[in-house]
Amino acid sequence: MTNNIKTITLNLGPQHPATHGVLRLILEMDGEVVNNTDPHIGLLHRGTEKLIEHKTYLQAIPYFDRLDYVSPMCQEHAFALAVESLLKCEVPRRAQFIRVLFSELTRILNHTLNIGSQALDIGATTPLLWLFEEREKIMEFYERVSGSRMHSNYFRPGGVAEDLPDGLLEDIDKFIEQFHPKLQDVESLLNENRLWKQRLVDIGVVLQQEAMEWGFSGPMLRGSGIAWDLRKSNPYDVYDEIDFEVPIGKNGDCYDRYLVRILEMYESIKIIKQCIEKMPKGAVKTNDPKLTPPTRAKMKESMEAMIHHFKLYTEGYEVPAGETYKAVEAPKGEFGVYLYSIGNNQPYRCRIKTPGFAHLQGLNFMSKGHLMADVITIIATLDIVFGEIDR
């Protein structure tokens, strides 16, 4: 006599706090064990790539803030680099240092949210409260430099929108001095915590070969022991002048990926310190009048400057025909922008490569054979945001 073993089909999300957005999972369960995971995406699709085709190059920048809304400036960075590549324009050194400085602040902004929310999913509330206090300070720096806490719209092809306000560099320096011990406090709470290790060690293991085959990048790739970081392998702006290490894991499990993110924040502190020390004086925008608007003082004196300013912001500037792909090491992995121009003031095609899209595809093989509670841990370690996955 044979027993017919029935599997249970379970719907998780999209309105579930642990799915980190609008993720819907169809789980095939054998009791408590997961047999199959089928992610349903597209619930936050806004047609960003198509919308960008109907905007000028300047008007397209805010769309990048709204993809991975946890780390907006890194995505603006990729778009700015792509447009600069087609324009073949020089970026002032001060602007390059400012962009690297804020990219690293953005990395801390992302990782603090990821570690805090991952701890909360597992049942530890303290790290979230400690880390959100630090995130608030970084968001204040965002606000001081761009006027906005989240959707900054700060990076520009050819530099940045505005120079740093007085006293900001000193305040960032003070922040990183006190952030270092705060990060050590979080480590002391989690690193050797018995419950934390039970929930993360040997969960969601990704071997080196699997990580490469699935197209993983960022901490998901480095957690498996592959030292691939675009800031080292394909440096952009002034990363080649800055001294930092690339942290890697050994086992490719959730615990190693957590440690990689912690160590990356220490490296970000080192990079920010070097940016503050080496920050040169000078312009923050290219001096090409086709890209940079005239100053307020000039507009008060000259009608031509007024017309130039108006036309620059209504019609934009023309970008030479051609195609390019530029990628940055965003906090979640490789964020790339493929730009195709036909020589007018709007992108003909803007293809966006997001790291979370590749990582979510690996959820099925990572969670197979684990308990349902472990699926929540794996979703947290993927560090997914649906703004960038659904686009």
UniProtKB/Swiss-Prot annotation:
Keywords: Cell inner membrane, Cell membrane, Membrane, NAD, Quinone, Translocase, Transport, Ubiquinone. Its main location: membrane. One of its GO terms (molecular function) is NADH:ubiquinone reductase (non-electrogenic) activity. It is found in: Cell inner membrane. It catalyses: a quinone + NADH + 5 H(+)(in) = a quinol + NAD(+) + 4 H(+)(out). InterPro entries: NADH_Q_OxRdtase_suD, NADH_UbQ_OxRdtase_49kDa_CS, NDH1_su_D/H, NiFe-Hase_large. Pfam families: Complex1_49kDa (PF00346). Belongs to the complex I 49 kDa subunit family. NDH-1 shuttles electrons from NADH, via FMN and iron-sulfur (Fe-S) centers, to quinones in the respiratory chain. The immediate electron acceptor for the enzyme in this species is believed to be ubiquinone. Couples the redox reaction to proton translocation (for every two electrons transferred, four hydrogen ions are translocated across the cytoplasmic membrane), and thus conserves the redox energy in a proton gradient. NDH-1 is composed of 14 different subunits. Subunits NuoB, C, D, E, F, and G constitute the peripheral sector of the complex. This is NADH-quinone oxidoreductase subunit D. It comes from Rickettsia canadensis (strain McKiel).
